[in-house]
Amino acid sequence: MDCGKSTLALQMDHNHRARGRGGVRFSRNDRAGKSRISSRLGLQTDAVEVGDGTDFWEEVMRRRTQGQRVDYLICDEAQFYSPEQVEQLAKVVDEIDVDVFAFGITADFRTRLFPGSQRLIELADRVQVLQVEALCWCGRRATHNARTVDGVMVTEGAQVVVGDVDMAMDPAATVESGHIPVVGYETLCRRHFMRRVTAHGANLMAEQDQLLPFEVDACLWHGTGGTGAGTSAEAGA
């Protein structure tokens, strides 16, 4: 999230169409609604909505039989595809020489690989990390997608809940007293993901710090260092 993958998908589609190639755009669970590819920059276009029963091989063969030119596929939100659908995409590439460009995130809000993303990594000819880096609220490169419910980071719930910075309802959540939990997503660096410190939480702690008669170690939320526990292991930030 926040790394420009849908923007790149739209740009890729534009570049190929500008050279006279014929393609089909696919997406699933886009934040703009069904049958759309949208980016946070405000760009969006129509697409074929991928469902549980979508068979990419049959879809391409049907279109070609009807006389449509299909040279490439743009597959956005590919993390939501099933492993079987990813295998169908590989077959489309290998058997009928159709180029497939898949865009998606690798892991969910629990840091677990999406099944579709895992199969893509296993089968793809090439995996590229997007050059546009998402940023954590602290300014570091964001590497994890956190889910928040009513502003509080959670690590349990349904794997797929469509949302963004807008509200969505978690189907695994219970509704009490007519309250519908507001679900959002935020990109965090590993440090603040592990500490469960979101931008909202950091702001609250900063406000509390201003009310205290003593100074609180800012590293707990500003990411300026650890708390003295040494380790010999290294991890890239």
Regions of interest found by a model, annotated:
Residues F80-Y81:
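Residues immediately C-terminal
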Residues A124:
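Short basic (Lys/Arg) and small-residue
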Residues E77:
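Walker B catalytic acidic pair
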Residues M12, E84-V92, G116:
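A short acidic, amphipathic alpha-helical/loop segment
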Residues V93-G116:
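Sensor-1/coupling segment of RecA-like P-loop NTPase cores
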Residues M1-R64, D108-R119, V132, A168-V175, ...:
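Conserved P-loop
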Residues E133-S177:
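Short recognition patches in nucleic-acid-associated and regulatory proteins
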Residues L73-I74:
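Walker B beta-strand of ABC/ABC-like P-loop ATPase nucleotide-binding domains
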